[in-house]
């Protein structure tokens, strides 16, 4: 198409030159040479374009075909920072350093001592290994022997070994992973929890509270820790869950008292 355009254009120019009697016309051989050069240039351009297309197709054919990402099916949960339960691997355990909480322990054996940050609490050993932990129970309770010092509420701390469910930070019920398979030996998840021994350590409520003006009661308080959990038995990951962490005295003013 471009060659035909060049020929028509040159014929048009030659016709103009023929009508112009005052201007000397171009020599015949010069005009023919110009036409030949234009045709050769157009042929060369088309040839180079075709070669570039062939090279590009050959290069793409040699590249390995990338697998297209699979579209999630309807009703299938998309993967975020949580993994399917069947894919629980060491990568999740490596994240424990980032999500570490002193009250959560992943271990292949039952812990016999409280975490270092909670050595002064009233630690209660695992009932299964009571004989082994009885000296420790005595040692960790020595701080209560100070004269003149009494706790408003009596608390106890222990490693919970059978936690199966919890409430996460969104208020959803999640399943706590009790055992995680990693390599040769599986590890279990333990939670160091603190709770009240009783709601009323004395007759009228909390110890040392003026019962004439106040109603008092010991209540277990909760806070959030990171733990390996699953939701709807599908997605496994580190979530914030609530566990018992302290015992506090709750007060309310008696009606009619000022």
From Swiss-Prot:
It is found in: Secreted. GO terms for cellular component: axon; cytoplasmic vesicle; dendrite; extracellular region; extracellular space; synaptic vesicle. Glycans are attached at residue 131. One of its GO terms (biological process) is neuron projection morphogenesis. Residues 60-85 are annotated as: Disordered. GO terms for molecular function: chemoattractant activity; growth factor activity; nerve growth factor binding; nerve growth factor receptor binding. Residues 67-79 have a biased composition (Basic and acidic residues). Keywords: Cleavage on pair of basic residues, Disulfide bond, Glycoprotein, Growth factor, Secreted, Signal. Disulfide bonds join 153-218, 196-247, 206-249. Brain and peripheral tissues. Seems to promote the survival of visceral and proprioceptive sensory neurons. Belongs to the NGF-beta family. Residues 19-139 form a propeptide. PANTHER family: NERVE GROWTH FACTOR NGF -RELATED, NEUROTROPHIN-3. Residues 1-18 form the signal peptide. InterPro entries: Cystine-knot_cytokine, Nerve_growth_factor-like, Nerve_growth_factor-rel, Nerve_growth_factor_CS, Neurotrophin-3, NTF3_N. This is Neurotrophin-3.
